[in-house]
A protein has these predicted regions:
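Active-site regions of metal-assisted phosphoester/phosphodiester hydrolases
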Residues: 1-61, 129-240
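Active-site surface patch of divalent metal-dependent phosphodiester/phosphate bond hydrolases
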Residues: 58-138, 236-240
Length: 240
Protein backbone atom coordinates (compact mmCIF):
# COMPACT_ATOMS: atom_id res chain seq x y z
CA UNK A 1 0.00 0.00 0.00
CA UNK A 2 1.52 3.32 -1.06
CA UNK A 3 0.13 6.60 0.25
CA UNK A 4 0.67 10.08 -1.10
CA UNK A 5 2.25 12.68 1.16
CA UNK A 6 1.54 16.41 1.06
CA UNK A 7 4.75 17.18 -0.81
CA UNK A 8 5.18 17.06 -4.58
CA UNK A 9 4.88 13.48 -5.80
CA UNK A 10 7.68 11.94 -7.85
CA UNK A 11 6.27 9.79 -10.63
CA UNK A 12 8.03 6.82 -12.13
CA UNK A 13 8.36 5.73 -15.74
CA UNK A 14 4.92 4.14 -15.57
CA UNK A 15 3.41 7.57 -16.12
CA UNK A 16 6.25 9.72 -17.44
CA UNK A 17 7.99 7.57 -20.02
CA UNK A 18 5.48 5.14 -21.52
CA UNK A 19 4.35 6.44 -24.89
CA UNK A 20 3.56 3.33 -26.89
CA UNK A 21 0.26 1.52 -26.49
CA UNK A 22 2.03 -1.77 -25.71
CA UNK A 23 2.85 -0.40 -22.25
CA UNK A 24 -0.23 1.71 -21.65
CA UNK A 25 -0.82 2.14 -17.92
CA UNK A 26 -4.20 1.73 -16.24
CA UNK A 27 -5.42 2.40 -12.72
CA UNK A 28 -4.00 4.66 -10.04
CA UNK A 29 -0.93 6.77 -10.69
CA UNK A 30 2.26 4.94 -9.80
CA UNK A 31 4.48 6.95 -7.48
CA UNK A 32 8.09 6.71 -6.44
CA UNK A 33 8.38 3.59 -4.31
CA UNK A 34 8.69 4.23 -0.60
CA UNK A 35 10.87 2.38 1.88
CA UNK A 36 9.62 -1.03 3.07
CA UNK A 37 7.34 -1.38 0.04
CA UNK A 38 7.02 -4.59 -1.98
CA UNK A 39 6.06 -3.61 -5.51
CA UNK A 40 4.39 -6.12 -7.84
CA UNK A 41 3.97 -5.22 -11.52
CA UNK A 42 1.71 -6.90 -14.09
CA UNK A 43 1.80 -6.47 -17.85
CA UNK A 44 0.16 -8.24 -20.79
CA UNK A 45 3.03 -8.44 -23.28
CA UNK A 46 1.05 -9.77 -26.27
CA UNK A 47 4.16 -11.84 -26.99
CA UNK A 48 7.54 -11.60 -25.39
CA UNK A 49 10.16 -10.82 -28.06
CA UNK A 50 12.80 -13.46 -28.70
CA UNK A 51 15.50 -11.05 -29.83
CA UNK A 52 17.55 -9.11 -27.30
CA UNK A 53 17.73 -6.32 -29.89
CA UNK A 54 13.98 -5.90 -30.12
CA UNK A 55 12.96 -2.47 -28.73
CA UNK A 56 10.08 -4.12 -26.87
CA UNK A 57 12.52 -6.43 -25.09
CA UNK A 58 14.58 -3.44 -23.97
CA UNK A 59 11.42 -1.58 -22.92
CA UNK A 60 10.33 -4.45 -20.67
CA UNK A 61 13.72 -4.60 -18.96
CA UNK A 62 13.75 -0.83 -18.52
CA UNK A 63 10.23 -0.93 -17.07
CA UNK A 64 11.22 -3.56 -14.51
CA UNK A 65 14.22 -1.51 -13.39
CA UNK A 66 12.94 2.07 -13.47
CA UNK A 67 9.61 1.20 -11.85
CA UNK A 68 11.51 -0.44 -8.98
CA UNK A 69 9.79 -3.82 -9.17
CA UNK A 70 10.28 -6.51 -6.55
CA UNK A 71 8.15 -8.97 -8.51
CA UNK A 72 6.83 -8.93 -12.07
CA UNK A 73 4.13 -10.94 -13.80
CA UNK A 74 3.98 -11.06 -17.61
CA UNK A 75 0.94 -12.61 -19.30
CA UNK A 76 0.35 -13.72 -22.88
CA UNK A 77 4.00 -14.62 -23.34
CA UNK A 78 2.84 -16.42 -26.52
CA UNK A 79 6.01 -18.51 -26.68
CA UNK A 80 6.57 -22.24 -27.08
CA UNK A 81 9.81 -22.49 -25.15
CA UNK A 82 10.97 -25.97 -26.29
CA UNK A 83 11.46 -24.54 -29.81
CA UNK A 84 13.31 -21.40 -28.72
CA UNK A 85 17.02 -21.44 -29.60
CA UNK A 86 19.51 -21.50 -26.71
CA UNK A 87 20.83 -17.97 -27.34
CA UNK A 88 17.24 -16.65 -27.33
CA UNK A 89 16.33 -18.14 -23.96
CA UNK A 90 15.63 -15.50 -21.32
CA UNK A 91 18.73 -16.26 -19.22
CA UNK A 92 21.07 -15.86 -22.18
CA UNK A 93 19.66 -12.64 -23.61
CA UNK A 94 19.42 -10.88 -20.26
CA UNK A 95 22.84 -11.88 -18.98
CA UNK A 96 24.37 -8.80 -17.33
CA UNK A 97 21.34 -6.63 -18.13
CA UNK A 98 19.48 -6.90 -14.82
CA UNK A 99 21.88 -5.37 -12.28
CA UNK A 100 19.58 -5.97 -9.31
CA UNK A 101 19.55 -9.72 -10.03
CA UNK A 102 16.52 -11.91 -10.76
CA UNK A 103 14.97 -15.35 -10.65
CA UNK A 104 12.27 -16.30 -13.13
CA UNK A 105 9.91 -19.01 -14.27
CA UNK A 106 7.91 -19.28 -17.49
CA UNK A 107 4.97 -21.60 -18.09
CA UNK A 108 3.27 -22.63 -21.33
CA UNK A 109 0.85 -25.30 -22.55
CA UNK A 110 2.92 -28.48 -22.37
CA UNK A 111 0.30 -30.47 -24.28
CA UNK A 112 0.72 -28.55 -27.52
CA UNK A 113 3.38 -29.18 -30.15
CA UNK A 114 3.71 -26.14 -32.44
CA UNK A 115 6.26 -26.35 -35.23
CA UNK A 116 7.57 -22.86 -34.47
CA UNK A 117 8.05 -20.70 -31.41
CA UNK A 118 4.54 -19.19 -31.34
CA UNK A 119 2.02 -20.61 -28.90
CA UNK A 120 -0.71 -18.35 -27.56
CA UNK A 121 -1.00 -17.96 -23.81
CA UNK A 122 1.53 -18.57 -21.08
CA UNK A 123 2.74 -16.62 -18.07
CA UNK A 124 6.11 -15.49 -16.74
CA UNK A 125 7.07 -14.53 -13.21
CA UNK A 126 10.15 -12.72 -11.92
CA UNK A 127 11.61 -12.10 -8.47
CA UNK A 128 13.93 -9.08 -8.56
CA UNK A 129 16.51 -7.53 -6.29
CA UNK A 130 17.26 -8.50 -2.67
CA UNK A 131 13.76 -9.89 -2.05
CA UNK A 132 14.53 -12.72 -4.49
CA UNK A 133 16.62 -14.26 -1.72
CA UNK A 134 13.38 -14.72 0.23
CA UNK A 135 12.03 -16.95 -2.53
CA UNK A 136 11.66 -20.48 -1.17
CA UNK A 137 9.75 -22.22 -4.00
CA UNK A 138 7.93 -21.78 -7.31
CA UNK A 139 5.24 -23.79 -9.05
CA UNK A 140 2.63 -23.83 -11.76
CA UNK A 141 -0.79 -25.01 -12.90
CA UNK A 142 -0.64 -28.79 -12.40
CA UNK A 143 -2.66 -29.51 -15.55
CA UNK A 144 0.32 -28.40 -17.64
CA UNK A 145 -1.82 -25.84 -19.49
CA UNK A 146 0.31 -22.92 -18.32
CA UNK A 147 -2.65 -21.01 -16.89
CA UNK A 148 -0.79 -19.75 -13.83
CA UNK A 149 2.56 -19.72 -12.09
CA UNK A 150 3.44 -18.81 -8.51
CA UNK A 151 6.34 -17.70 -6.33
CA UNK A 152 6.40 -18.35 -2.59
CA UNK A 153 8.41 -16.04 -0.32
CA UNK A 154 9.40 -16.72 3.28
CA UNK A 155 8.97 -13.80 5.65
CA UNK A 156 9.60 -13.44 9.36
CA UNK A 157 8.80 -16.44 11.48
CA UNK A 158 6.50 -18.80 9.64
CA UNK A 159 4.89 -16.15 7.45
CA UNK A 160 4.77 -16.87 3.71
CA UNK A 161 3.68 -14.74 0.78
CA UNK A 162 2.50 -16.47 -2.39
CA UNK A 163 2.43 -14.30 -5.53
CA UNK A 164 0.37 -15.87 -8.31
CA UNK A 165 0.42 -14.74 -11.94
CA UNK A 166 -2.42 -16.05 -14.09
CA UNK A 167 -3.98 -15.72 -17.53
CA UNK A 168 -7.64 -16.60 -18.05
CA UNK A 169 -8.52 -17.33 -21.70
CA UNK A 170 -10.77 -15.13 -23.76
CA UNK A 171 -14.21 -16.46 -24.73
CA UNK A 172 -14.37 -18.94 -27.58
CA UNK A 173 -13.13 -17.50 -30.86
CA UNK A 174 -12.76 -18.77 -34.41
CA UNK A 175 -9.17 -20.02 -34.51
CA UNK A 176 -7.95 -23.48 -33.56
CA UNK A 177 -4.80 -22.16 -31.89
CA UNK A 178 -6.36 -19.67 -29.46
CA UNK A 179 -5.83 -20.23 -25.75
CA UNK A 180 -9.51 -21.17 -25.42
CA UNK A 181 -9.19 -23.73 -28.22
CA UNK A 182 -6.01 -25.22 -26.71
CA UNK A 183 -7.66 -25.69 -23.34
CA UNK A 184 -10.89 -27.01 -24.83
CA UNK A 185 -8.96 -29.64 -26.78
CA UNK A 186 -7.20 -30.77 -23.59
CA UNK A 187 -10.44 -31.05 -21.60
CA UNK A 188 -12.28 -32.90 -24.37
CA UNK A 189 -9.45 -35.43 -24.48
CA UNK A 190 -10.15 -35.95 -20.78
CA UNK A 191 -13.90 -36.40 -21.50
CA UNK A 192 -14.53 -33.08 -19.80
CA UNK A 193 -16.79 -30.69 -21.71
CA UNK A 194 -16.48 -27.74 -19.35
CA UNK A 195 -15.92 -24.34 -20.88
CA UNK A 196 -12.22 -23.37 -20.43
CA UNK A 197 -13.15 -20.08 -18.76
CA UNK A 198 -15.30 -21.89 -16.20
CA UNK A 199 -12.63 -24.54 -15.71
CA UNK A 200 -10.02 -21.85 -15.06
CA UNK A 201 -12.16 -20.21 -12.38
CA UNK A 202 -13.01 -23.50 -10.67
CA UNK A 203 -9.46 -24.86 -10.70
CA UNK A 204 -7.90 -21.62 -9.45
CA UNK A 205 -10.53 -21.33 -6.71
CA UNK A 206 -9.57 -24.77 -5.41
CA UNK A 207 -5.89 -23.87 -5.47
CA UNK A 208 -6.45 -20.64 -3.55
CA UNK A 209 -8.30 -22.57 -0.84
CA UNK A 210 -5.42 -25.07 -0.56
CA UNK A 211 -2.84 -22.30 -0.31
CA UNK A 212 -4.91 -20.49 2.30
CA UNK A 213 -5.03 -23.65 4.43
CA UNK A 214 -1.22 -23.52 4.52
CA UNK A 215 -1.51 -20.09 6.09
CA UNK A 216 -0.10 -18.25 3.07
CA UNK A 217 -0.84 -14.63 2.37
CA UNK A 218 -1.90 -14.65 -1.29
CA UNK A 219 -1.69 -12.03 -4.01
CA UNK A 220 -3.26 -12.84 -7.39
CA UNK A 221 -1.98 -10.87 -10.38
CA UNK A 222 -4.56 -11.86 -12.97
CA UNK A 223 -5.23 -11.04 -16.60
CA UNK A 224 -8.88 -12.02 -16.23
CA UNK A 225 -10.49 -11.20 -19.59
CA UNK A 226 -13.56 -10.44 -17.50
CA UNK A 227 -15.41 -7.61 -15.80
CA UNK A 228 -13.78 -7.52 -12.38
CA UNK A 229 -16.59 -5.43 -10.91
CA UNK A 230 -19.33 -8.02 -11.28
CA UNK A 231 -18.08 -10.88 -13.47
CA UNK A 232 -17.51 -14.55 -12.65
CA UNK A 233 -13.92 -13.96 -11.53
CA UNK A 234 -15.04 -11.27 -9.08
CA UNK A 235 -17.66 -13.63 -7.65
CA UNK A 236 -15.09 -16.39 -7.30
CA UNK A 237 -12.69 -14.11 -5.43
CA UNK A 238 -15.47 -12.89 -3.14
CA UNK A 239 -16.08 -16.48 -2.02
CA UNK A 240 -12.50 -17.06 -0.92
Amino acid sequence: MEESSGRREELTSAEMQRKDDQAEAWGDRQLKKKKHTFRLLLQNTQRLPLSARDPKHEAILNWMFTDEANAVILTEINTYWPNVRPHQQWTERTRGKIPQGEKHRFVHNRHGSPTGTLQYGGVGTFALGPTRHRLCSTGEDLTGLGRWVWMRYKGKGEHHLRVVGAYRPNPQGTGEHTVHAQHQKYFLQKANNRDPQLAFTQYLSKQIKKWALLGDQIVIALDANDNLRDGSVQRMMARQ
